[in-house]
A protein has these predicted regions:
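Fold-independent oxyanion-binding glycine-rich loops
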Residues: 17-18, 58, 125, 146-148, ...
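Generic structural signal for residues in well-ordered beta-strands
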Residues: 12, 36, 119-123, 192
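RNA substrate-binding interface of SAM-dependent RNA methyltransferases
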Residues: 39, 45-144
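N-terminal positively charged helical leader segments and presequences
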Residues: 1-43, 94
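Short acidic/polar active-site loop segments enriched in Thr and Asp
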Residues: 7, 77, 191
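Active-site/ligand-binding-proximal alpha/beta "capping" segment
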Residues: 137-138, 142-182, 190-194
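Structured adenosyl-cofactor binding patch, chiefly the S-adenosyl-L-methionine
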Residues: 179-219
Length: 219
C-alpha cells in the first residue's frame, strides 16, 4: 500500500488464491492494517491452459528465491524443492520449514505483481529419492532435464506432442543430477529432455522449459 501510495477511497483488487478476485475500496489505513469495503466478485481466470509442475534441485543462496518468483510469474502449477546428491544447499528440518514459508511468501508477492489470482503451492523440501518414490502417478507426461546428448530436444517434443494433461518437469541443482539419479528418474517413467548444447544454470533451465511449454499451450 505504501509503495503504491494509496489513500482512502482508492480502489484495489483482492484475491484469495483460489477463486477469482474482488474489487474493493480502501476505507482507512493504519501502520499494520487496512480496512476495506469488499465489492463485486469477478470470476477471472488467468491460469495457463497447461498445468506444469516443477521439481527442482535447489540452487544455493538467493537463486532459489529468484527461481520461485519467476516460476510463479510464468505459471508453474506447483514447485517442489529437492535435495539431490550434488545440492550445495542443505537444510535441517526446522530450516526447511522456515524456507518453505519464505518461498510461499515469495510466491504470494509474485502473484500480486503479475495479476495471477491462483496461488501455486511451494512444497517443503524433500530428498530426491523420496520424491521419485512418491511422485504423482496421475501426471502422465514426466520429463527430466538432461545434458545427455541422446536426450530428446525440447523443440522436437513441442512439435510432436499435444499437451493436454499435467506435465512434471524435473531438474537438478548446480552440477545437475548425478548419473544414478537420472537413471532412477528414467526408470520411473521420466523422459530425458534437452534444452540445447549450452549448460544452463540450475535456476535458468527449469524456467526456460516452463516458459516454452507455457507459450506452446497458449498458442
Amino acid at each position: 500500500m505504501q509503495v503504491l501510495r494509496l489513500q482512502p477511497e482508492d480502489t484495489i483488487t483482492l484475491f484469495n488464491g483460489r477463486n477469482g478476485e474482488w474489487a474493493a475500496t480502501i476505507l482507512r489505513m493504519g501502520r499494520a492494517n487496512v480496512a476495506v469495503r469488499v465489492e463485486q466478485h469477478h470470476a477471472i481466470e488467468r491460469e495457463a491452459p497447461l498445468e506444469v509442475h516443477l521439481a527442482v534441485g535447489m540452487p544455493a543462496n538467493e537463486r532459489m528465491d529468484w527461481l520461485v518468483e519467476k516460476a510463479v510469474e510464468l505459471g508453474a502449477a506447483s514447485i517442489q524443492p529437492l535435495l539431490a546428491e550434488r545440492s550445495v544447499l542443505r537444510l535441517s528440518a526446522d530450516r526447511a520449514l522456515k524456507k518453505q514459508m519464505h518461498w510461499q511468501g515469495i510466491a504470494i508477492a509474485a502473484c500480486e505483481q503479475c495479476g495471477r489470482n491462483r496461488l501455486p503451492p511451494v512444497h517443503a523440501a524433500r530428498p530426491l529419492q523420496d520424491f521419485q518414490a512418491w511422485h504423482q502417478s496421475s501426471v502422465q507426461r514426466r520429463f527430466v532435464l538432461s545434458l545427455d546428448t541422446d536426450s530428446q530436444p525440447l523443440s522436437r517434443v513441442l512439435m510432436s506432442q499435444e499437451f493436454e494433461g499435467p506435465v512434471l518437469l524435473l531438474s537438478g541443482p548446480e552440477g545437475g543430477l548425478s548419473p544414478a539419479e537420472e537413471k532412477a528418474a528414467l526408470a520411473t517413467g521420466f523422459h530425458a529432455l534437452s534444452l540445447g548444447p549450452r549448460t544452463l544454470r540450475a535456476e535458468t533451465a527449469p524456467l526456460a522449459a516452463l516458459a516454452a511449454l507455457t507459450l506452446q499451450a497458449f498458442n
